[in-house]
């Protein structure tokens, strides 16, 4: 009964999101919304052009040709009209060949554009006759992601059809439509486009959100089926899913695939808006790319996330999504990101010419708040100490849901960068092991063991990977001791309904916040329950992160990580992981990780306070032959020649394990960040109160509930030391608390808010008591 009620609630939520989609848009008067097969969608207006621009935008085309900021784009397109030289044509034409657009398709697109401006019938007719035969006869040999090339070819045909519409003869319209349907049936998503997934996968890229949508709009008057099918699936599945996660201001496909996946979301935005439907997306879409802004390292690289490869010779840019989002939302921060590398790929240059806002200014991120939170369904936090070369960057993750595909099983993971990658995501997407479904990818790189998270090792646990796509298919992946593989055999959800009804929930955000100044916070806090990320081998797993901006040139930052891990069997061994590039040094309860190569000079020193020294085993694993070690097997993945010069895929990890078998264990680790030449760090003291455990470090006092449960009763502890301390007390019941020091009222009423359950105040040494 509870399960049925839960599924009913999911159905209502999804249907409500479909219903409210129209509420985001400002539809033009000649665009009406209709219900088609149970899906509400905007209908293309009875006018041409309506694809990528309307009649009111046509007069501006000549101005854009003379715009100084678009002159190079126009010159590039003129040059792109030249055919490929035979010697330059590869033997196997994959999508990259077609995306490096040249020749016929560019010529006819520019003819169609010229026709819009001049209305010269000869030009319009030439565009039509130049492309129609090729549309009918073109063949595409199977090759990597060839649907992208087929779809781009369809886009060219759609441009000619829509922009030269009044020059088309009735029989030519029929020929175009038949050719489009023929090509659509070659696409990976099929025609009707019902194959693959709408949240992740190739059907969440060009095929539906640009290619079929474009053709459907162009030919709607003569053949409404294609638009109804493509737009029907888009509004029922693609849009609903995105409007569900967009309010979090983040994306789920990692820092490489963010580029292509989000670009196509934005193509759908522009296509429908220019058609006249307005913005159908949740306005949170504007802020998705801010994640990349916050993860931008001082060396120009991006903090790793999801399926990525490394090369310091090639900084990571988000040219097209930054252009599309920046110009649409008039966002100067995004335009600044675009201008880092304004070299748009050939197949998108026409869209830069049509859509780029050349009057938009640019703005550095220097005045943005230093911490950024991404809420449900993610639960991610980024904390920085600044925007310059001395900046520390820390990432903290809960992962309320696992979207799979290019997202990893990394609930509870963290990363730290300072003058080089210190606490890293290990492994890499491609290399000597292969690609998406390589042994390295599915047994190490995508798995919890490759991240700074927690393992609970049940030697009998199995991990079904029978649904995981790609070559090198296996029914099972290695037992890494980590988080379960959601879905049936690790297959991603098709749509939002399947995601919410399935087993893709992996965590819950328990608390988050930063302050006391939101612009330059002293602390940044995130806590999550990630029990659901694991199988029944665990009863409870909670992790708290607290990042401290120490505002000290010598030791600029620290991060405290507190964990509660309860296994279903006390014999299941627990592991606290810390990954690095260079070999760590272990002395007692201290772990030192340095960057000494490739121009890097940062250092991380971790002090393990829990488990107690007598119950703590700290070891390192790594070096050639054990760099990607998974309980007896090394999943080697050497970089391709000329890539990963700094070995950012890593080679070492530290494991902290309790010596004594127990169902319940706690970890408390204090990480200080400094230059690798810094000799003196802050003393780290553990605080033990009657209901709390915590850390005294520099001028900071931080506490957590000893049991990781909410503290709702009076408690206390003592502080010894000189000067004034800044206190951050977490895990408190929201509401008013009174603070006593040495038996006297220090603060008669301090409020712990509901979102973070934390108190922040200042005080000196003494005995503190906290009352409700």
From Swiss-Prot:
Where N-acetyl-D-glucosamine binds, per the record, is at 96, 145, 148, 196, 205, 261, 307, 405, 429, 436-437, 470
Keyword Ribonucleoprotein set for record: no
Report which superkingdom the organism of origin falls in.
Bacteria
Instruction: Name any Gene Ontology BP term.
Output: heparin proteoglycan catabolic process
- In this protein, the active site sits at 202, 257, 406
Instruction: State the compartments where it is located.
Output: Periplasm
The reply to whether Acetylation figures as a keyword in the UniProt entry is no
Q: What is the effect of changing residue 429 to A/F?
A: Impaired catalytic activity
**Major location category of this protein:** periplasm
UniProt keywords (A-Z) are: Glycoprotein, Lyase, Metal-binding, Periplasm, Signal, Zinc
- Pfam families reported for this sequence: DUF4962 (PF16332), Hepar_II_III_C (PF07940), HepII_C (PF18675)
> Which residues carry a glycan?
134
Matching entries from InterPro entries are given as: Chondroitin_lyas (IPR008929), Hepar_II_III_C (IPR012480), HepB (IPR054645), HepII_C (IPR040925), HepII_N (IPR032518)
Family to which this protein belongs: Belongs to the polysaccharide lyase 12 family.
Query: Its function?
Result: Cleaves both heparin and heparan sulfate glycosaminoglycans through a beta-elimination mechanism. Cleaves heparin at alpha-D-GlcNp2S6S(1->4) alpha-L-IdoAp2S and heparan sulfate at alpha-D-GlcNp2Ac(or 2S)6OH(1->4)beta-D-GlcAp.
Identify this protein by name.
Heparin and heparin-sulfate lyase
């Amino acid at each position: 009964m509870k399960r049925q009620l839960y599924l009913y609630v999911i159905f209502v939520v999804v249907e409500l999101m479909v219903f409210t989609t129209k509420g985001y848009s400002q539809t033009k008067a000649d665009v009406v919304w209709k219900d088609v097969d149970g899906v509400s969608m905007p209908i293309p207006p009875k006018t041409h052009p309506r694809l990528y621009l309307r009649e009111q935008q046509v007069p501006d085309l000549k101005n854009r040709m003379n715009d100084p900021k678009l002159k190079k784009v126009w010159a590039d397109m003129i040059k792109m009209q030249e055919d490929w030289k035979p010697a330059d044509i590869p033997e196997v034409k994959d999508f990259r060949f077609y995306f490096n657009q040249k020749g016929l398709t560019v010529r006819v697109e520019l003819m169609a554009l010229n026709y819009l401006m001049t209305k010269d019938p000869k030009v319009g007719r030439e565009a039509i006759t130049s492309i129609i035969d090729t549309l009918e006869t073109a063949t595409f040999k199977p090759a990597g992601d060839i649907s992208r090339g087929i779809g781009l070819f369809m886009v060219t045909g759609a441009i000619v059809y829509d922009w030269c519409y009044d020059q088309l003869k009735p029989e030519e319209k029929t020929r175009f439509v038949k050719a489009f349907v023929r090509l659509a049936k070659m696409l990976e998503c099929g025609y009707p486009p019902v194959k693959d997934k709408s949240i992740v996968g190739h059907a969440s890229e060009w095929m539906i959100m640009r290619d079929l949508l474009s053709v459907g709009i162009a030919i709607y008057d003569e053949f409404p089926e294609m638009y109804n099918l493509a737009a029907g699936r888009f509004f029922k599945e693609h849009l609903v899913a995105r409007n569900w996660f967009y309010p979090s201001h983040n994306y789920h496909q990692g820092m490489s695939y963010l580029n292509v996946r989000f670009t196509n979301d934005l193509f759908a935005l522009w296509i429908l808006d220019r058609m006249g439907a307005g913005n159908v997306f949740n306005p949170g879409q504007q802020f998705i790319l801010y994640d990349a802004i916050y993860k931008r390292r001082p060396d120009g690289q991006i903090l790793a996330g999801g399926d990525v490869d490394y090369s310091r010779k090639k900084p990571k840019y988000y040219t097209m999504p930054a252009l599309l989002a920046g110009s649409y939302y008039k966002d100067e921060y995004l335009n600044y990101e675009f201008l880092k590398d304004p070299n748009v790929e050939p197949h998108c240059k026409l869209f830069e010419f049509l859509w780029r806002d050349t009057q938009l200014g640019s703005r550095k991120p220097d005045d943005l708040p230093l911490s950024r939170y991404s809420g449900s369904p993610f639960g991610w936090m980024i904390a920085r100490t600044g925007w310059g070369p001395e900046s520390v960057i820390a990432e903290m993750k809960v992962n309320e849901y696992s979207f799979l595909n290019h997202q990893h099983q990394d609930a509870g993971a963290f990363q730290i960068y300072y003058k080089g990658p210190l606490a890293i995501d290990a492994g890499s997407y491609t290399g000597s092991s292969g690609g998406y479904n390589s042994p390295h990818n599915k047994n190490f790189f995508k798995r919890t063991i490759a991240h700074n998270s927690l393992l609970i090792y049940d030697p009998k646990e199995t991990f079904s990977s029978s649904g995981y796509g790609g070559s090198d298919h296996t029914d099972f992946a290695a037992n890494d001791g980590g988080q379960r593989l959601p879905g049936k055999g690790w297959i991603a959800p098709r749509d939002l309904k399947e995601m919410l009804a399935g087993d893709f929930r992996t965590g819950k955000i328990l608390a988050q916040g930063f302050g006391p100044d939101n612009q330059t916070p002293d602390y940044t806090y995130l806590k999550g329950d990630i029990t659901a990320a694991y199988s029944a081998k665990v009863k409870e797993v909670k992790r708290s992160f607290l990042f401290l901006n120490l505002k000290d040139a010598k030791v600029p930052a620290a991060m405290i990580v507190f964990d509660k891990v309860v296994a279903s069997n006390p014999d299941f061994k627990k592991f606290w992981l810390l990954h690095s590039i260079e070999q760590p040094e272990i002395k007692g309860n201290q772990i030192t990780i340095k960057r000494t190569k490739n121009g890097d000079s940062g250092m991380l020193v971790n002090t393990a306070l829990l488990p107690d020294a007598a119950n703590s085993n700290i070891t390192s694993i790594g070096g050639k032959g054990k760099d990607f070690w998974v309980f007896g097997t090394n999943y080697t993945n050497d970089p391709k020649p000329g890539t990963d010069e700094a070995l950012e895929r890593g080679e070492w990890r530290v494991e902290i394990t309790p010596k004594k078998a127990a169902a319940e264990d706690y970890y408390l680790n204090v990480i200080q960040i400094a230059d690798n030449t810094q000799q003196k760090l802050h003393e780290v003291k553990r605080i033990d109160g009657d209901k709390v455990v915590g850390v005294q470090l520099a001028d900071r006092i931080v506490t957590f509930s000893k049991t990781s449960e909410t503290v709702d009763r009076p408690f206390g502890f003592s502080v010894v030391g000189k000067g004034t301390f800044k206190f951050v007390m977490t895990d408190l019941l929201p509401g008013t608390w009174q603070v006593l020091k040495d038996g006297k009222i220090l603060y008669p009423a301090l409020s712990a808010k509901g979102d973070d359950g934390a108190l922040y105040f200042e005080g000196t040494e003494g005995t503190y008591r906290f009352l409700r």
